[in-house]
Regions:
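Short active-site neighborhood of thiol/selenol oxidoreductases, capturing the structured segment around
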Residues: 80-111, 121
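N-terminal chloroplast transit peptides
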Residues: 1-28, 32-40
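Thiol/selenol-based redox catalytic cores and closely related redox-interacting motifs
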Residues: 150-286
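Structural microenvironment flanking redox-active thiols in thiol-disulfide oxidoreductases
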Residues: 103-141, 151-155
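Cysteine/selenocysteine-centered motifs that mediate thiol-based redox chemistry or coordinate metal-sulfur cofactors
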Residues: 305-318
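Short acidic, S/G/P-rich loop/turn micro-motifs used as interaction or catalytic elements
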Residues: 95-99, 130, 287
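A short, polar/charged loop-to-alpha-helix boundary motif
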Residues: 286-306
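A short beta-strand-turn-helix
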Residues: 60-88
Length: 318
């Protein structure tokens, strides 16, 4: 992740307007002359106190967690589900009829082979029943053996994940009302920006509708390839994926949704563990605030001790 790349690049350090007489005009300086001589060791962000008790929380609520593959409670086998040794990515999905869970699951499936080749385990916990978990895995292609489910939000509370809009109100609102308000951006930071971004696309992001991808929508992708080109996130591309997900979710709503409607707005997060120590921790701020799978992958693939300070100069030039 932290490999050094180029050798030199043109750099203009003068902020003044240059004139023909300026002896400094158009000069270049090797980037490596700075980066090879200066090293700034920056400490990594200290994990939240509750994440340092990750294993304790998992064990305390292990009887509420059921493996989707066989429907059995984790109980005393929680160490087998989330290994104590090695590198492990743990996804805390929202409820299984949620946009976030579907998008993240589809993207992660694309990377599972890469994780396995690098001896990195992937596990997920989601809100719902075992039957909902089976339906979710069938439709997103997320492996059943890597997913456990719970119908309680206690574990999510222990990890201090946002319970969603309206939790502190004196009046208990119906879960669907809270969900609609959050979809409109109320009590859900960043949601509207992310939704709008899905319509505009970005030249700086990779496409999501790619042949062979788990998130592909072939009919739309082929049309976009012909009319808008390839190799970047095209306008309406993310919106197309979200529309496809929404259609499938609504068509199978009764199979997927939690009985407790208050779980409709419960947010989740993600961890990366190294020998049972959390060194990466993400909390969803709102709807569509799930962890960027590429960022998750970068942290999971860090070489050496992930707790060691990193070279800020080297990272700056990545």
């Amino acid at each position: 992740m932290f490999s050094s790349k180029s050798t030199t690049r043109p750099t203009n350090y003068s902020l003044r307007k240059q004139t023909p007489n300026s002896k400094r005009a158009n000069k270049t300086r090797p980037r490596s002359s700075l980066s090879s001589q200066v090293s700034i060791k920056a400490p990594r962000r200290k994990p939240r106190e509750t994440t340092e008790r990750f294993r304790e929380h998992i064990e305390n609520f292990s009887r509420d967690l059921r493996r989707v593959s066989d429907g059995e409670s984790l109980g005393e086998t929680s160490d087998d589900f989330v290994p104590k040794k090695g590198r492990v990515v743990v996804l805390m999905f929202t409820q299984l009829a949620d946009f976030d869970s579907w998008e993240l699951a589809k993207f992660i499936v694309n990377d599972i082979d890469l994780y396995e080749r690098n001896n990195i385990e992937v596990r997920a916990i989601g809100l719902g029943t075992v039957e909902a978990g089976k339906s979710f895995c069938k439709r997103t292609r997320f492996p059943q053996e890597k997913l456990a489910v719970t119908e309680e939000q206690d574990l999510y509370r222990m990890f201090e994940y946002s319970p969603g809009f309206g939790d502190a109100l004196p009046v208990k609102l119906p879960g669907m009302v809270k969900l609609l308000l959050m979809c409109a951006g109320i009590g859900s930071p960043g949601t509207l920006k992310t939704v709008v971004g899905g319509y505009f696309g970005s030249k700086n992001k990779k496409p999501v509708l790619v042949e062979g991808s788990n998130a592909d929508v072939p009919e739309v992708r082929k049309l976009m390839d012909l009319t808008l080109g390839k190799d970047y996130l095209r306008p309406f591309e993310m919106a197309t994926l979200r529309l496809a997900n929404m259609t499938e979710i609504l068509n199978n709503w009764d199979e997927l949704v939690c009985k407790n409607d208050q779980l409709l707005v419960q947010r989740g997060g993600a961890f990366v563990l190294d020998d049972d120590r959390v060194f990466f921790d993400h909390r969803d701020a709102g709807i569509l605030g799930y962890c960027d799978p590429n960022r998750l992958k970068e942290f999971a693939m860090i070489d050496g001790d992930p707790k060691e300070p990193f070279d800020a100069i080297e990272i700056m030039h990545e």
